[in-house]
Every structure is written in structure tokens, then in C-alpha cells.
């Protein structure tokens, strides 16, 4: 299940699939407006070849590409040999993204466990071990990498 913010795209990755019913179900937790855009109209544009249609297509392709890379990264996490390696990979990626040894992942420990395909208590136990080994420190969703060298060894 995914939570979307205002302005997010839903079903964009599936919109070009011909003749199949979407497996995506959307449930709104508050009043919501959805804009349905027919794929053929997006791709064909208008008779004026206006910049708006070009920009819409560019934005759509960019959004789909970002989702692809996020899913690819998550697949790499899930293919890791151990939970420790998955944790190390996730934390190292966040370090590279932020350029800082201290960062917040956002969400709960349960969210992180779900994302990494793990049990929450197993995840908590493993990050506790990593803390004892001087690899990292943490408080709630905020992590600080204490030894980048040790963390990268766990990344593999």
C-alpha cells in the first residue's frame, strides 16, 4: 500500500497497458479529486503542437523513470543476502543522497521493516547490534553513521 500526497500520480505506470483492467485500487482518506487523462490524448498532443503537451509528456516520462529507479533500488535491497546488508544498503543510499552522515528516514520502524521485507523486531535487533558495534547511532527515525568504513563492509 502506498500513501500519496496532493498532486501525486496514480496509475501512471499502467496507463499505457492496452486492454487490461488496472490492478490498482485507490482509497481516499479525505475528500479527493482525481483527474483522468486518456493516454492516447497525452501521446498525440493537440493540433497546435503546444508546449503544454510536450511538457506534460516530459513530466510523465520523468515520473515513471523515477518510480522505475526507486523500484529497482528496492529490488536490490530485497535481493541482499541478509537483513544486515539490506539495512546497510538503505542507510548508505540515504547518506549518499543527503551528503550527510546524519539523516532522517521518515516513517516508523515498522515502515522501514516493511520496506526492507523484514520483521520489525528483527530489524530493531539488527540495528541494535550495529549500534553496539559502533557502526551507527539512532533515535527513532534519525540515524547517524559513526563508521562509514564498517557500514560499507556490510553493504558488500
Where is each model-derived feature located?
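Cyclic-nucleotide recognition modules
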Residues: 1-61
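Noncatalytic linker/hinge segments flanking ATPase motor cores
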Residues: 2, 23-31, 45, 67-83, ...
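Residue-level signal for pocket-adjacent positions within structured domains
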Residues: 5, 10, 70-73, 98, ...
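Generic structural "secondary-structure junction" signal
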Residues: 6, 11-12, 16-17, 77, ...
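A broad, structure-centric signal for solvent-exposed, well-ordered loop/edge residues
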Residues: 10-11, 17, 33-35, 44, ...
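Polybasic "coupling" helices that flank or enter modular domains
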Residues: 29, 51-117
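Phosphate-/nucleic-acid-contacting segments
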Residues: 83, 90-156
Amino acid at each position: 500500500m502506498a500513501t500519496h500526497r496532493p498532486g501525486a500520480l496514480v496509475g501512471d505506470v499502467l496507463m499505457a497497458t492496452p486492454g487490461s483492467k488496472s490492478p490498482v485500487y485507490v482509497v481516499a482518506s479525505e475528500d479527493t479529486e482525481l483527474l483522468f487523462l486518456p493516454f492516447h490524448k497525452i501521446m498525440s498532443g493537440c493540433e497546435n503542437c503546444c508546449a503544454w503537451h510536450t511538457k506534460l509528456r516530459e513530466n510523465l516520462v520523468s515520473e515513471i523513470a523515477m518510480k522505475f529507479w526507486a523500484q529497482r533500488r528496492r529490488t536490490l535491497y530485497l535481493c541482499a543476502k541478509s537483513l544486515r546488508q539490506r539495512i546497510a544498503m538503505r542507510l548508505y543510499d540515504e547518506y549518499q543522497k543527503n551528503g550527510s552522515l546524519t539523516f532522517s528516514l521518515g516513517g516508523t520502524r515498522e515502515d522501514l521493516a516493511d520496506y526492507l521485507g523484514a520483521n520489525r523486531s528483527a530489524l530493531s535487533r539488527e540495528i541494535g547490534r550495529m549500534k553496539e558495534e559502533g557502526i551507527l547511532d539512532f533515535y527513532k527515525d534519525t540515524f547517524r553513521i559513526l563508521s562509514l568504513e564498517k557500514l560499507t563492509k556490510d553493504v558488500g
